[in-house]
Amino acid sequence: VLSLQTLNRHQNQLDLIFYNSKTNNTSVVLKEIDKAYVDITDNLTFLEDNSFIWTSEKDGYNHIYHYGKKGKLINQVTKGNWEVTNYYGFNEKNNTIYYQSLENGSINRDVYSITLDGTNKKRLTKNTGTNDADFSANFTYFINTYSSATQPPLYTLNDAVNGYVFKTIKTNSELTKTVSEYKMSKKEFSTININGNDLNMWMIKPANFDAKKEYPLFMFQYSGPGSQQVANRWNNANDYW
């Protein structure tokens, strides 16, 4: 059986289709329909029993789902008012899914593991900021790339079971030292209410900021897709304004 995905011209309906090469028959096993658009991913993962893992925004947030081989929903693996921002894969030996999400705040990223039935969820990264993972082929280890608004990228080798740090690969300590020698203000995160919605924002004040004085304001904003600008991560360019 061959699987394929089709998207209509408006990009708001995606069909997951199975094609049987022996019978030359096709069947639509799953439909994704949205008023605006449907994101395409490479997250489709087939299991030994021909069931499959799928990610979808159908409940308003991007989450992980487990479907039977005929497209019947078995269970929603992750759920909550937060997004799964990266699906790393599935380890069939221990029945575990690995993913990145916003569960620790929408400006942060953490790496998690969870069993296929939605239980035994573990946060594998401990530092608040942006964490990303590159897993070994057998999901035994992962290299964690961590940074924050004040911490340059830190690379560690971690245990995929509990997140234990086996080894620090690169600290960027020299960069940290160099940056500390400059009198730069820290990035301040907060929210602003626009039309009833709390939107994330950040502000960098002058190093000698005086609340009694008025200062010119420079605003930076970009609304391209998949381009979150307010994030607790290291920015080696724009933060030097």
Regions found by a protein language model. Give the residues of each.
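Hydrophobic helix-coil surface modules that form long, contiguous segments used
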Residues: 9-14, 23-31, 226
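A short loop-to-beta-strand structural motif that recurs across blades of beta-propeller domains
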Residues: 15-17, 63-65, 110-112, 154-156
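Extended, hydrophobic alpha-helical segments in both membrane/secreted and soluble proteins
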Residues: 12, 25, 40-43, 52-54, ...
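Multi-bladed beta-propeller domains
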Residues: 19-43, 68-91, 102-104, 114-131, ...
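Structured core elements
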Residues: 3-4, 18, 28, 45, ...
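Beta-strand C-termini and the immediately following turn/loop, strongest in propeller blades
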Residues: 3-10, 17-20, 45-59, 67-68, ...
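Repeat-solenoid scaffold signature
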Residues: 95-97, 108-145
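Serine-hydrolase catalytic core recognition
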Residues: 130-241
